[in-house]
Amino acid sequence: MNEGYDKIVEAETQNFRKLWFLDRYLANHDGYIAGGCFKDIFNGEPVKDIDIFFRDRSEFDRAKRYYERNEDFALAYDNDKTIAFRDLKSTSGIVIELIKKTFGEPIEMIETFDFSITKFAYYMEETPFDNEEDEDDDGTYMKNKIAYHKDFFEHLTMKRLVIDNKLDHPLNTLNRSWRYAGYGYGLCRESKEKLVKALQAVPEREIDFGKDFYDGVDW
């Protein structure tokens, strides 16, 4: 574990069967899934959209080409932040969003998310074989892994919005807290105080509640 991410837990996926359907969306590219869809999955709610992130632009470009050529998916929309495809085989009409505005490693990425209940990632990691006889030419294989905030499940059950890192874009965070409030989630006392202090430091000229607060990380 990276010492800089001491609040993040890493684990294998064999005990998380309800996540296995996500393998369909990790096939044939090197992206990873992160963000709000895990809240819906663990709450037993329908998953409407899945956010797929990438370590760099070239990974995004390869995934984009794959979905453009895949007849099981249809273009849903495209803007400067994401390109989205609808899964035509999904009974619930799942839309996958390929994020093209921000890039990084899975744990690095979820650490930038506002709330602990969004800090969850599902990804593939190159892993050495335990048995040398099973090794391929590289001596490694791809293993499914997850990474999540250590309090993810507790805060999800309590419907608590907890901010535990620096607020670089407090207006964005405020906007997202309103959205989550519509689903019954509320800021804890400490997070309210942190958000208020951060908002007080925002220059008045930058405050515009009618604008789109999205700044590339809206999960």
Give, region by region, the residue ranges found by the protein language model.
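Catalytic cores of the polymerase beta-like nucleotidyltransferase superfamily
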Residues: M1-W219
